[in-house]
């Protein structure tokens, strides 16, 4: 629609009963054909080409939305703190490799990672070329179970179609590490397993999360 927001970030996304709404258009501009906006934006959400051209385009917003989605799906609450712990964060931002340096949580499905990675590609021509193209890729994902961490080694979720409640958790004994899945407080034996190694148990748990986030 010719409007460039230039400040897409979690703080500017408002949640309501109808879904998510983008807010704070204080830096927004209307672009003409072939025009580019002035150098504005949230530094950590800017694409690498900005640091050489000092201009913003629709691809700048697409990159910023991709970074916002990356933060949301990985539950990164302390974004600034996460960046400060990285080696040479300014260099990573300017190279467009900040998200790659941080990495995804292991339970993020490959299909979602591919969509985000395309949106935040360091090469502008390899990104989605329009917001509608980006949206269409996301809409092809069919939500399965809406999982969220509830405690260390534990996730709870609601099935987006049936409303069933799920809980999966890792517990340990002196001899084993156990992953238990419950549906509406009933243990689902076919999805429970025991392991001698904690890493293998976590891998099993995270694989289940990743395989059920979308149908």
Q: Model-flagged regions — what are they?
A:
Residues 36-50:
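Conserved activation segment of eukaryotic-like protein kinases, specifically the C-terminal portion
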């Amino acid at each position: 629609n010719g409007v460039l927001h230039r400040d897409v970030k979690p703080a500017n996304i408002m949640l309501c009963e109808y879904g998510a709404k983008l807010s704070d258009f204080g830096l927004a501009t209307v672009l003409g054909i072939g025009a580019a906006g002035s150098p504005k934006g949230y530094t950590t959400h800017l694409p690498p080409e900005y640091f050489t051209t000092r201009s913003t385009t629709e691809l700048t917003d697409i990159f910023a939305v991709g970074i916002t989605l990356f933060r949301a799906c990985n539950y990164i609450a302390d974004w600034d703190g996460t960046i400060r712990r990285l080696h040479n964060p300014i260099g990573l931002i300017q190279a467009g490799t900040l998200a790659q340096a941080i990495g995804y949580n292991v339970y993020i499905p490959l299909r979602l990672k591919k969509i985000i990675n395309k949106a935040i590609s360091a090469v502008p021509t390899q990104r989605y070329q329009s917001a509608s193209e980006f949206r269409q890729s996301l809409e092809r994902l069919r939500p399965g179970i809406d999982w969220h961490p509830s405690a260390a080694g534990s996730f709870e979720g609601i099935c987006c179609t049936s409303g069933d409640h799920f809980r999966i958790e890792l517990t340990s004994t002196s001899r084993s590490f156990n992953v238990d899945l419950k549906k509406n407080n009933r243990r689902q034996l076919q999805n429970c397993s025991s392991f001698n190694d904690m890493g293998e148990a976590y891998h099993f748990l995270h694989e289940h999360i990743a395989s059920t986030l979308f149908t």
